[in-house]
């Protein structure tokens, strides 16, 4: 039995191509893996702590030797919430990420969430020589990204998500691109339908 974290970086909309493909993937995944535990994290519905001045100052104080209990109440609340997001990622065996491509990059909320999983001392560490090494292993990720244009995985969003996941130790990253719908509007429905079929095929193997 695996624990699957599903990170949704797209507001709900019946027109969302991202969500259509994600739903097809998850429907099939649940059929194939009925005993797995699915935990959904909708970044547009939940409050998760972004890095801000209080987080930076809390990290500085802890690094200087202060205890968590010595931090201000605001620092404690924010850091605890930030750490909860990190721990949620660490507890997952598989991670599914779904997002649209916005200005060649992932949505800002997804970037903020990724900051919570890219944490020195928890998901990676620096060696004595200054080299960064991952602290996670054995995880798998599946990335769904929808885009109106055609980028063939050369966009910054694709490379960023894969790069960070690899950096923290997630070496198995499968990408499903749903793209070209705006560039070829007459083919848009078929592109999405084909992606749904492909998502189900890949769900069987994930």
Task: State each model region's role.
Residues 11-13, 148-152, 182:
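Short histidine/acidic/glycine/proline-rich micro-motifs that form metal-
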Residues 22-27, 118-122, 162:
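Short, well-ordered amphipathic alpha-helices
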Residues 74-159:
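Helix-loop-strand module that forms the ligand-binding subsite of alpha/beta enzymes
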Residues 41, 144, 176:
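Hydrophobic residues at beta-strand termini and immediately following loops
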Residues 1-99, 104-112, 197-206:
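N-terminal beta1-alpha1-beta2 submodule of the flavodoxin-like/Rossmannoid cofactor-binding fold
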């Amino acid at each position: 039995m695996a624990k699957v974290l599903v990170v949704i970086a797209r507001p709900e909309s019946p027109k969302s191509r991202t969500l259509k493909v994600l739903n097809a993937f998850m429907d099939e995944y649940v059929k194939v893996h009925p005993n797995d535990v699915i935990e959904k994290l909708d970044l547009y519905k939940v409050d998760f702590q972004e890095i801000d001045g209080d987080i930076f100052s809390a990290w500085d104080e802890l690094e200087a030797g202060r205890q968590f209990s010595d931090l201000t109440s605001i620092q404690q609340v924010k850091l605890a919430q930030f750490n909860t997001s990190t721990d949620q990622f660490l507890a997952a065996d598989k991670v599914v990420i779904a997002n649209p491509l916005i200005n060649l990059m992932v949505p800002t909320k997804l970037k903020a969430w990724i900051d919570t999983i890219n944490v020195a001392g928890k998901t990676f560490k620096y060696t004595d020589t200054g080299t960064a090494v991952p602290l996670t292993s054995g995880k798998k990720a599946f990335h769904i990204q929808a885009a109106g244009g055609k980028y063939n995985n050369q966009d910054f969003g694709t490379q960023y998500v894969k790069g960070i996941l690899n950096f923290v130790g997630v070496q198995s990253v499968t990408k499903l691109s749903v793209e070209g719908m705006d560039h070829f509007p007459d083919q848009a429905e078929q592109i999405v339908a084909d992606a749904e079929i492909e998502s189900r095929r890949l769900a069987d193997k994930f």
